[in-house]
Amino acid sequence: MTADRLRLSVVIPVKDDATALAVCLGALAAQSEHIFEVIVVDNGSVDDSADVARRYGATVITEGSPGIAAAAGAGYDSARGEVVGRLDADSVPSTDWAARVLEYFHRHPTTSAVTGGALFVDGPRALRRVGARLYLGAYFVLVAGALGHTPLFGSNFAMRASAWRSVSAEVHRRDGLIHDDMDLSFHLGPHGIRYSADLHVGISSRPLSGGGMRLRLRRGLRSIVLHWPAQLPWLRVWARIRQAG
């Protein structure tokens, strides 16, 4: 498959988030000429998330094991494209998101994964941009410190299918108390993760709610502890230097 014929599969794990999912899928439908398939992974929804996905022409698969890691992994396994994009149900991709994902991989043939940032689409309007920048700025700085390289942001990233296949047996997909994007970042790191300011999505500010933030912090800590001390950041950096040399 030549670079100019890369196919993009978009994976969206969901549980009981039909309203947000409809907005996400509507945004993807407007750029469908750049998307080979959309895969929605239903992780035990009791609302009409699956029906919403089918109305927008998405492929729906069911993952019975609870947790985003299990659902996302099932979606990646099912993807048929050479590039696998990942959005959350509350992600609202920009009108050129899919085209920019494909363009990035065309231009960077040795990069295995690329991630971008986000802006909040709800909450106080005056705080949407600054709040998202503070939240994501802290995420990228702190998690990069734990990893020794750029982390993936689960609401907005894409990777080569070949990169996923190389680590799919290693990730902790059955652990419901981790951040799947952080876990995947630990395993994909040696293969090359890059940040692109050109990949834009909107997201909900729900992670900043009291309960949501506490849960994210717990998951983040567990995601790191699972990989330390064997993958302390300076050891990972040194391993990459030796590999490059």
Regions found by a protein language model. Give the residues of each.
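Short beta-strand-to-loop acidic/aromatic patch adjacent to the donor-nucleotide binding site
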Residues: G81-V92
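Short, acidic, metal-binding catalytic loop of nucleotide-sugar glycosyltransferases
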Residues: G26-I35
